Amino acid sequence: MGQNITLKNSPLQVIRTVNDKLMSYNVEFTEVTGGTFWKAYTPEQIAGTEKFNVGGATDIAAAMANLMQVYPPIDLYNEKLRKLAKEFGPVWVRVSGTWATKTFYDWDGTGVIPEGYQNILTKEQWIGVLDFVKAIDAKLLISIANCDGNHKHDEPLDMTLIKKLYEITYEYGSTIDATEFVNEPNMLDITGFPVGYTAEDYSRDQDAYFGWVKENYPDTLCVGPCNTEGTMGDKEKQAEMPVGGVEAFSGNMASCDQLMEGTKVPMDVYSYHYYNGISERLELVMPQMHWDPDKTLTEGYLSVAPACCEYNMPLRDKYVPGGEMWVTESGDAGGGGNTWASTYVDVFRTLNELGTFATLTDGVIFHNTLASSDYGFLKHGTFETRPNYYAVLLWNRIMGTTVYNTEEELREGAHVFAHSRRDGKDGVAYCIINNSETDTTTVELPASAEVYKLSADTLRATVMKLNGKELVLDENDNVPEMAPVVMEGTLTLEPATIAFVVM
């Protein structure tokens, strides 16, 4: 049965004001230095006409060789990349990832990876990051190295190279606006820590680092703990099969409480990671965490992001009372994204996450990634735009920072979110998601409205349409005009369509 919605253009109840950089993103550390990351899916796998497999491997260790490939460093001076990134307006850029935890800062240009590290970052590469952030008028969030090359687990964190990272940054005229200590510390065995590292070691070292930051760079926000706990995966599958398998991949795990209870230096922002599940690449080891593609528009699938937020809110209140929550990695699936991550169907999850998060709390969502792997806004290497790029670009252009109560319960066919207008004019901006694959949603407009309707030829289309016109770059890599149509009366949202409505 189709849903009926009546919008209001009169004053609505204000829920909160949210960060104007709510929509932000990651540039993976391995992109900056060059290195291994997830091997791209084939066009047939993306279209859903070819099943993904891990090359006959029967365990994750054997599979990894088929799942990864080596990529050269990203060119952060690329004119097309900068132009497309700048379209978003001011954002946060997070340069981090597990790769960062094991990277040596090769400020002297030796080209040698010291024992205990796995990768090197050159001074030129770091300056490239700073130039990119400045060119697009962004703010920078980082994490630092903490591995056997830095110190043994029962020794204090060696700050020598870390201090140099800050010195080089500030001598260049840039700033480190925020920092996490390390990426995903819950996974003690695989995140890159010194051998034998414990939750107690983590608490000691986070205090040492954040204490030093607060003393020497008081304007830098201390963010953490980069928690990986929370709701994830298909609950129906989890009810039918054991939840085990995570340990086979992640090894020894620590809870957020175990990491944080021993700390003494307060944080400024609470952070966690959200993925809706795990991709086909890791389904072999964690099948209960992988979603089948025919569930991507279901209420169960779309409920994961707000459930993960609600799980972390009490932890935020405990460890950073009154602080913002930052989702410092967000995507459809851990493991580089699902085969459908780069297609139209993931737009529903992305916009629903932005809407539900802003309804629940204040903070920033760092989409993983800007231009790496299948969940990137842009295709790796060519920087071709994907549906999610245009979806969040419209969000940033249309949806303001004041969040209103729509008085509409979230339900199939009617995920409705209301904000102030981004242009600052009086009125209301709505995002309305019809996630039903079979039924039409009707929307009654109380006044003349500007409508931006999103659709595609198929759910797994790699090109999205705005008011019937394909959203693709022109021959000069310019973003197409994204103009609304003016409507009055009744707006019809066909199955699996989305509309921004501005009044």
Model-inferred region functions:
Residues 184, 214, 273-275, 290:
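Histidine-centered active-site/metal-ligand motif
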Residues 1-181, 185-238, 244-254, 261-266, ...:
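Non-catalytic accessory regions flanking glycosidase/transglycosidase catalytic cores in CAZymes
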Residues 121, 127, 275-334:
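Glycoside hydrolase catalytic-domain groove-lining segments
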Residues 260, 264-276, 280-283:
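Anion-binding catalytic surfaces of enzymes that hydrolyze or transfer phosphate/sulfate esters
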